[in-house]
Amino acid sequence: MTNIRKSHPLLKIVNDSFIDLPTPSSISAWWNFGSLLGICLALQILTGLFLAMHYTSDTATAFSSVTHICRDVNYGWVLRYLHANGASMFFICLYLHVGRGLYYGSYLYKETWNVGVILLFAVMATAFMGYVLPWGQMSFWGATVITNLLSAIPYIGTSLVEWIWGGFSVDKATLTRFFAFHFLLPFITSAMVMVHLLFLHETGSNNPTGIPSNADMIPFHPYYTIKDILGLFMMITALLALVLFAPDMLGDPDNYMPANPLSTPPHIKPEWYFLFAYAILRSIPNKLGGVLALVVSILILIIIPLLHTSKQRSMTFRPISQCLFWLLVADLLTLTWIGGQPVEYPYVIIGQLASVLYFSIIIVFMPLVGLMENYLLKW
């Protein structure tokens, strides 16, 4: 008799995805982040669901309802800080996952990569709308500044912004719709994760060498289930340390003040995981130019497969490309730092140089170095 997990219509899908899935024997811990992201998404949906039971999306009571969750709901503070810091863990895992894809040439699985980029946009949109919900000062002004950027779109800009706001400023209508979309998007994201995995399992996983590994595969369970559980424990430990010892470390103190449309905070800035894009936005003096640079800084990931000139897939055996990759990482860290600084000398010029370098590395230097390495290897 066939094993039920191999014959049952539903269990068969689970079996082929997580149990008997043929996996390259050489994949390193950098391949753990997919499962960690899945767990992050599940955690966010779960904590978010319980928070939504106590939250009210009305400008008069939103701030008070968050206070009520933290003070009066049983373990409400744990839920709230797990959700807020869970978002930070989500983005740490996301950026490491994308970085892994760039380093090892995983972007050559174009369908998987493109769905992944759409997923990144979906998670960013969800996080932005979630930041608005507590209705603190930074929530209100962050929403005002970022949505107002759309007014730079020629001809339809102003109408578009007012349509998104549901009025002439960020107000009750804006908060209500942001809550609705913040609740909805994670479920859409979950469906897209299925598509992401569907495309991935069509080709199988890449591996650190970038060489096809069809001849050397092992079952996902028990080898990689155990390996992923180690990564999970490490992430949960880091998250709990953050939640229980420094829950506000990554937040903004201004958000503990209720939203006040008549008082602007001295430095309006988004959450830390958007600071690199915010720095690119601010480094261009023109409004439309800044908005375009902001969008392109993420959208550029879509064209990375087209910019691959090397005859090797992975960077494992390409030292010059490795140097460029780590320069890109350092540049992104610099942009993140600049995004949190005030708009004054020397931060402005550093931000502008880092922004130019960011686009130059991806569009110019990496393809050229790929060609150069081909030439050096006489290929």
UniProtKB/Swiss-Prot annotation:
Function according to Swiss-Prot or TrEMBL: Component of the ubiquinol-cytochrome c reductase complex (complex III or cytochrome b-c1 complex) that is part of the mitochondrial respiratory chain. The b-c1 complex mediates electron transfer from ubiquinol to cytochrome c. Contributes to the generation of a proton gradient across the mitochondrial membrane that is then used for ATP synthesis.
Q: Cofactors per UniProt? A: heme b
Q: What is this protein called?
A: Cytochrome b
Biological process according to GO = mitochondrial electron transport, ubiquinol to cytochrome c
Q: Which family does it belong to?
A: Belongs to the cytochrome b family.
General remark: Heme 1 (or BL or b562) is low-potential and absorbs at about 562 nm, and heme 2 (or BH or b566) is high-potential and absorbs at about 566 nm.
Q: How is the cofactor bound?
A: Binds 2 heme b groups non-covalently.
Membrane topology according to the record: Multi-pass membrane protein
Keywords carried by this UniProt record: Electron transport, Heme, Iron, Membrane, Metal-binding, Mitochondrion, Mitochondrion inner membrane, Respiratory chain, Transmembrane, Transmembrane helix, Transport, Ubiquinone
GO CC terms, sorted: mitochondrial inner membrane; respiratory chain complex III
Annotated a ubiquinone binding sites: H201
Give the residues the record marks as binding heme b b566.
Answer: H97, H196
Transmembrane stretches in the record are 33-53, 77-98, 113-133, 178-198, 226-246, 288-308, 320-340, 347-367
Q: Which organism is it from?
A: Cnephaeus serotinus
The record's section on InterPro entries has: Cyt_b/b6_C (IPR005798), Cyt_b/b6_C_sf (IPR036150), Cyt_b/b6_N (IPR005797), Cytb/b6-like_sf (IPR027387), Cytochrome_b (IPR030689), Cytochrome_b_C_euk/bac (IPR048260), Cytochrome_b_N_euk/bac (IPR048259), Di-haem_cyt_TM (IPR016174)
Q: Where in the cell is it found?
A: Mitochondrion inner membrane
